[in-house]
From Swiss-Prot:
It comes from the Bacteria. One of its GO terms (biological process) is L-threonine catabolic process to glycine. The gene is tdh. The record marks D148 as: Important for catalytic activity for the proton relay mechanism but does not participate directly in the coordination of zinc atom. It holds the Pfam family ADH_N. GO terms for molecular function: L-threonine 3-dehydrogenase activity; zinc ion binding. It is an enzyme of class 1 (oxidoreductase). Zn(2+) 1 binds at C38, H63, E64. This is L-threonine 3-dehydrogenase. SMART domains: PKS_ER (SM00829). It comes from Xanthomonas axonopodis pv. citri (strain 306). Pathway: Amino-acid degradation; L-threonine degradation via oxydo-reductase pathway; glycine from L-threonine: step 1/2. Keywords: Cytoplasm, Metal-binding, NAD, Oxidoreductase, Zinc. Its cofactor is Zn(2+). Binds 2 Zn(2+) ions per subunit.
Length: 340
């Protein structure tokens, strides 16, 4: 079967022929229909410092997908051949304190598909049946293909009460863009998104952001004054940029709450006085809550949330290089690849 493989320890991804995997007793074989390129996949493609210490060459990458059940393991019940599914890409152990305590998204033994084990950029893949998420008929496959990052956005946006609140989102990648839309959809007052990429800031505005700010051209403090704000009640840090995080700390209202998804450089510093003397709450966000986030994000789409606005490109798998080029250049929202 075709698969996108990190063949060499260099920049690039290669379309190769690999064997079709065989599902174990509790696993399901999935025939992939559509997959989406994630920022993580771009890191692996670029072969940056994180990838070099994390990824083993020869890996089939990818973790954002939708497909149909092609084969059931001998112990699997509750699913049918041909059923359309996505899946939680974090495979957890099921027996640690957090898994047994109802917090599997915090499992210290988590294995990520497309990072630690072979992933979804292939014609077929296997997944534990317990990780599957059935996709309702009303949701098109090109949207279901990126439920994984949509879930990251939902986890962040729903971590704190944003109804009637002023929200600052630093980083207008696809997750930040989606989070901006969720915050407005559920009743935030002002949602301000910052970045230095005008293409993606426009997507955030289209998704419903009150104001978008290119911080290389405009002062965030000036925007706050224009909106008659004393500070932000909720911050969602999506950029992984320490300067953006420190700007957020500077602009938070006393008692504000921050959800952090962006991964900061090792050794990145911050002004701890701002956190302490403003009484800020800072909450790390990892993955999606299993499976509360999946329920909520599915119902958001079914209730009219415009997830489609972040989808900018759909390409056949043979044009995968164009998709990675668009991502590298920052000239795309979500890029979906078709395996049909």
């Amino acid at each position: 079967m075709k698969a996108l493989v990190k063949r060499e320890a260099n920049k690039g991804i290669w379309l190769e022929q690999v064997p079709v995997p065989t599902p174990g007793p509790n696993e399901v074989l999935i025939k992939l229909e559509k997959t989406a390129i994630c920022g993580t996949d771009l890191h692996i493609y670029l072969w940056d410092e994180w990838s070099q210490r994390t990824i083993e060459p020869g890996l089939t990458i990818g973790h954002e997908f939708v497909g149909r059940v092609a084969e059931l393991g001998s112990a699997v019940t509750g699913y049918q051949i041909g059923q359309r599914v996505s899946a939680e890409g974090h495979i957890v152990c099921g027996h640690c304190r957090n898994c047994r305590g109802g917090r599997p998204h915090l499992c210290p033994n988590t294995v990520g598909i497309g990072v630690n084990v072979n992933g979804a950029f292939a014609e077929y893949m296997v997944m534990p049946a317990s990780n599957l998420w059935p996709i309702p008929d009303q949701i098109p496959s090109e949207l279901a293909a990126f439920f994984d990052p949509y879930g990251n956005a939902a986890h962040c946006a729903l971590e704190f009460d944003v109804i009637g609140e002023d929200v600052l989102i630093t980083g207008a990648g696809p997750i930040g863009i989606i989070a901006a839309g969720i915050c407005k959809h559920i009743g935030a007052r002002n949602v301000v998104v910052t970045d230095v990429n005008d293409f993606r800031l426009k997507l955030a505005a289209d998704m419903g952001a009150t104001r978008v700010v290119n911080v290389s051209k405009t002062s965030l403090k000036d925007v706050m004054a224009d909106l008659h704000m004393e500070g932000f009640d909720v911050g969602l840090e999506m950029s992984g940029n320490s300067r953006a995080f420190n700007d957020m700390l500077d602009c938070m209202y006393h008692g504000g709450k921050i959800a952090m998804l962006g991964i900061m450089p090792r050794g990145a510093g911050c002004d701890w006085d701002k956190i302490i003397f403003k009484g800020l709450t800072v909450q790390g966000i990892y993955g999606r809550k299993m499976y509360e986030t999946w329920y909520k994000m599915t119902q958001l789409v079914l209730s009219g949330f415009p997830l489609h606005k972040v989808l900018t490109h759909q390409l056949p798998i043979d044009d995968f290089q164009k998709g990675f080029d668009l991502m590298e250049e920052g000239k795309a929202g979500k890029v979906v690849l078709s395996w049909n």
